[in-house]
């Protein structure tokens, strides 16, 4: 009985693992970007910068990307990889100067 259960569990895990694709360059929270630096919105320097450019963020713990540029999924594999801070960000209200709602990613 135990051996049948072990075989069933092993087969089930194998099917689940095969059916769940994982793409390293997938960005589910926004646009994939490379930022020169990242900081939380409540960091004094970041907060001052956001105030100067008129960006209001309600979540003070939100990760903010500074001086960001888009990364294309095609470009990641062909040499334009991000050597600074690769992140997925919800929005970039001031072009690439500030990106809001960022999540770190591995590329």
UniProtKB/Swiss-Prot annotation:
GO molecular function: structural constituent of cell wall
Subcellular locations according to the entry: Secreted; Secreted, Cell wall
Keywords annotated in UniProt: Cell wall, Disulfide bond, Secreted, Signal
Biotechnology: HgfI has been widely tested in the development of antibacterial materials and as a biological drug carrier.
Keyword presence, Nucleotide-binding: no
Tissue/organ expression: Only weekly expressed in hyphae cultured in liquid medium.
Superkingdom of origin: Eukaryota
Record flagged with keyword Chloroplast: no
Alphabetical list of InterPro entries matching this protein: Hydrophobin (IPR001338), Hydrophobin_CS (IPR019778)
Cross-referenced CDD domains: hydrophobin_I (cd23507)
GO cellular component: extracellular region; fungal-type cell wall
Disulfide bonds: 27-88, 34-82, 35-68, 89-102
Signal peptide bounds: 1-24
Role: Aerial growth, conidiation, and dispersal of filamentous fungi in the environment rely upon a capability of their secreting small amphipathic proteins called hydrophobins (HPBs) with low sequence identity. Class I can self-assemble into an outermost layer of rodlet bundles on aerial cell surfaces, conferring cellular hydrophobicity that supports fungal growth, development and dispersal; whereas Class II form highly ordered films at water-air interfaces through intermolecular interactions but contribute nothing to the rodlet structure.
Family in the record: Belongs to the fungal hydrophobin family.
Quaternary structure, from the entry: Self-assembles to form functional amyloid fibrils called rodlets with a length range 100-150 nm. Self-assembly into fibrillar rodlets occurs spontaneously at hydrophobic:hydrophilic interfaces and the rodlets further associate laterally to form amphipathic monolayers.
Name under which the protein is recorded: Class I hydrophobin hgfI
Protein species of origin: Grifola frondosa
Gene label: hgfI
